Regions:
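Glycine- and aromatic-enriched alpha-helical transmembrane segments of multi-pass membrane proteins
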Residues: 2-11, 308, 312, 316, ...
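Membrane-interface helix/helix-cap signal primarily in integral membrane proteins
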Residues: 12, 17-191, 494-499, 508, ...
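Aromatic-rich juxtamembrane segments at the membrane interface
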Residues: 116-248, 253, 327, 511-513, ...
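Di-metal (Zn2+ and/or Mg2+/Mn2+) metal-binding site signature of metallo-dependent hydrolases
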Residues: 189-214, 508-532, 641-652
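Internal transmembrane alpha-helical bundles of multi-pass membrane proteins
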Residues: 238-420, 428-431, 612, 620, ...
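Conserved beta-strand hairpin/beta-sheet module of binuclear metal-dependent hydrolase folds
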Residues: 360-363, 455-508, 598-621
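Active-site-proximal loop/helix segments of hydrolase catalytic cores
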Residues: 491-500, 514-515, 519-530, 589-675
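Active-site HxH/HxHxD metal-binding segment of metal-dependent hydrolases
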Residues: 519-562, 567
């Protein structure tokens, strides 16, 4: 440390940022405006299939409205000019909204992500006009050049190859399919899909070598290399990893010019200090942590492992470097993605040697493809072959039982103990006692993988899926889902249901009950079942209501499930499923039930556990309630039917069940007006405590050691509190 003062400065800086973040826990500022007119400067824009995404800054609007940056979305209904240029002064009419905090455990935190980038709000533009046609020429030129190069890639490659090349070389991930992202993530090689230090090092070193050898002296070659790398960074969007790599390459070239020794850890620290001075909150971004953790793992652990085993063999050094990366970044990956690839070291050792060739031939393909498509296609042939090979090997790896381990999100104390063990490991390795320091490392990994998400006897969670339904029941050994869909959240299975399950360490769902065939109860489940490898979370049995008279939507759902080879089971009145101490009884429907509304054919499930009784009612309405009302008595918990519609939860029904607590699953400001005032009034009249997913986020009840606990994810950040009246 004495020889590396920059490392000390960085540590002090990080501690200061952490203390500041802990002390300043302000409530987010509300930017809600239904319609507002404002002036702003265009910072960047990206064309999407359904319109544009723009980032604008220096926003000043009517009624003293102002903020630093806003992310704007423009679609086919937005009135806007045909051409936009970075630097344009825009006059915008839009609705402005604050970023939502996550409503469920495991859900992506768009509020945290955007605020760390300095973007304070989002808006949906109705009209965009150019007020002043100012243009930032270098940035705008590079932006347009990037679009032209993307067109070249698209013309020379098939869609899948073009998406990967654009991500790796041009920094544009919009063309990557979900299947490719998932495959690379499950194999632990998702980092190759981003422009990283590997790319910058290869490009920078090659440029410097060629310029110095054939064109100019060392000083000139270093300056030109730095300028070109900086422009390449702007061209590709200057991501966090690109910024780090460019700064570190600059430090290396400056050391070369000054005739000084290049110290990687000092350069890494200097790069981090530069980024944190500009955006301190970027410290909490997964991309920042992974980028710096990767390089730190290489610098620290390659020498440690090579010295311990007294080997400088290139293959062993590659394994040591990859192992070092995994050791440093493991808690970051588990905190962000909740899963870990056992074969990631092998995948990296196999795939990384190809990256130099892929990068060189891809750059050549882009350059030559701009002149003649034939030459471009020829150059991209190597990349296409490599990606096919990666896909084939990657699919083999993920099919190996236990290749991907879903651990759940580790707690803070687990992460601290893990890194504490890592620091102790580094001290012990100086003694050359392999067994001792390996045991220390093994202890850290063991602590990190400890299951901490099922320290309860029973858990019932109602997820925030917008205008839809999804409930999760967990025992010590099993997980059951009741419904899974939404009418206003896109890809609800991918972005809310599966992340929740993975964050809790769940890799297998024993039973999935689909109460009826409405999309807002099923589309997330179908999306999940139809995804590659079921997004890593398997489903045992799908249970549907047993009906003689089936509507078209029910038949369509049945066909989809059968086509995916799902294990199906049908329930009717009187059927039961017993799981551990949990008993799930079907109260409705019976096969000959003649329903007028498909909602009234919903599965109605009574859940019994010791002295607890819960009732799940799907979208059951008053006509269906009359079929079961005589079979009902007091329940502790009611999942309110049909999102709180006034046509459900009749007075007679509620008087019969008199639930202690009632949970309503509905979307924020939904177009149906759910929950209706009449329903809320009826629940109030019987003295039932009401919780709503649109206001409180995920609502969870846990039974542990004879006591019930409640946690509200959005309203109370998931903190448990004792329910004294249960």
């Amino acid at each position: 440390m004495r020889r590396r003062p920059l490392c000390v400065v960085l540590v002090c800086m990080i501690l200061g940022i952490l203390c500041n973040a802990w002390i300043n826990t302000k409530e987010p500022v509300s930017y809600e405006r239904e319609s507002i007119h404002f002036l702003c400067e265009l910072e960047e824009f990206v064309k999407k299939d359904n319109g544009y995404t723009l980032v604008v800054r220096d926003v000043k609007g009517e009624n003293s409205f102002s903020c630093k940056k806003i992310k704007l979305y423009a679609n086919e209904n937005t009135a806007m000019p045909k051409e936009l240029h970075i630097g344009n002064l825009l006059a915008v009419t839009a609705s402005i909204h604050s970023f939502e905090k996550p409503g469920n455990p495991g859900q992506f935190d768009e509020y945290k992500y955007n605020t760390e980038l300095g973007i304070t709000a989002q808006g949906f533009a109705g009209k965009i006009e150019i007020k002043k046609n100012t243009v930032k020429n270098p940035e705008d030129f590079l932006h347009r050049l990037r679009n032209q190069l993307q067109d070249v890639v698209s013309l020379c490659c098939d869609e899948k190859t073009a998406g990967i090349v654009s991500a790796m070389v041009l920094g544009d991930k919009s063309g990557l399919s979900d299947e490719v992202k998932q495959l690379y993530q499950e194999n632990g090689i998702a980092h190759v899909l981003a422009i990283s230090g590997l790319h910058i090092s290869l490009i920078g070193a090659s440029l410097f070598f060629v310029l110095r050898k054939y064109f100019m002296p060392m000083q000139g070659a270093a300056v030109v290399t730095m300028v070109l790398l900086f422009l390449y960074g702007i061209l590709t969007g200057f991501s966090i990893s690109t910024q780090r790599a460019v700064i570190m390459m600059g430090c290396m070239l400056l050391a070369r010019l000054a005739g000084r020794h290049y110290d990687g850890l000092s350069a890494l620290s200097f790069s981090a200090i530069c980024q944190l001075l500009i955006h301190p909150m970027v410290l909490f971004q997964t991309g920042f942590l992974l980028s710096y953790g990767t390089v730190l793992g290489i610098y620290v652990f390659v020498d440690v492992f090579c010295d311990a085993w007294e080997s400088k063999n290139p293959i062993w050094m590659a394994v040591a470097g990859t192992a070092g990366i995994e050791l440093v970044t493991l808690p970051i990956l588990l905190t962000a993605y909740y899963e870990f690839s056992i074969l990631s070291i092998a995948a990296n050792v196999l795939f990384l040697p190809f990256m130099g060739g892929i990068l060189v031939t891809s750059l050549a393909g882009i350059g030559l493809g701009s002149i003649t498509l034939f030459a471009g296609k020829f150059c991209f042939g190597f990349a296409h072959f490599c990606f096919m090979l990666f896909e084939w090997i990657g699919n083999l790896f993920v099919k190996i039982p236990g290749a991907v381990v879903i651990t759940g999100k580790p707690t803070d104390w687990q992460v601290l103990l893990y890194y504490g063990s890592g620091v102790l490991f580094l001290f012990l390795q100086k003694w050359k006692q392999k067994k001792i320091f390996l045991l220390t490392l093994a202890f850290g990994v063991f602590v990190l993988f400890l299951p901490v998400h099922n320290n309860f006897d029973l858990q019932i969670s109602n997820l925030d899926v917008g205008q839809g339904d999804c409930s999760c029941i967990r025992t010590k050994n099993h997980t059951i889902l009741i419904d899974g869909g939404s009418s206003d959240v896109n890809k609800v299975g991918k972005y809310r249901m599966v992340p929740f399950l993975k964050s809790q360490g769940i890799s297998y769902v024993s039973y999935l009950f689909l109460t009826h065939s409405d999309k807002d109860h099923t589309n997330g489940a179908v999306e999940w079942l139809c995804a590659a490898n079921q997004m890593g979370v398997k489903i045992g049995t799908v249970i549907l209501p047993k009906l003689n008279e089936k509507e078209e939507a029910y038949c369509t759902l049945l066909d989809e499930l059968r086509n995916k080879g799902c294990n199906l089971m049908f329930m009717q009145r009187g059927d039961t499923v017993t799981i551990d101490e949990l008993r799930i009884s079907c109260l409705h429907p019976y096969p000959d039930y003649e329903w007028k509304s498909a909602n009234d054919s919903s599965l109605v499930l009574k859940v019994n556990y010791q002295n607890f009784t819960g009732l799940f009612t799907g979208d059951l309405e008053e006509a269906g309630e009359k079929e079961i009302i005589k079979k009902l008595s007091h329940v502790n918990y009611l999942k309110v039917a049909h999102h709180g519609s006034k046509g459900a939860s009749s007075e007679a029904f509620l008087e019969q069940v008199k639930p202690d607590v009632s949970v309503i699953s509905c979307g924020k400001k939904n177009r149906y007006g759910h929950p209706h005032k009449e329903t809320l009034k009826r629940l109030e009249n019987i003295g039932s405590k009401v919780y709503r997913t649109d206001k409180e986020g995920a609502v969870s009840f846990e039974y542990q050691n004879g006591k019930w606990y409640l946690s509200l994810w959005k309203k109370e950040s998931g903190k448990k509190r004792l329910l004294s009246d249960w």
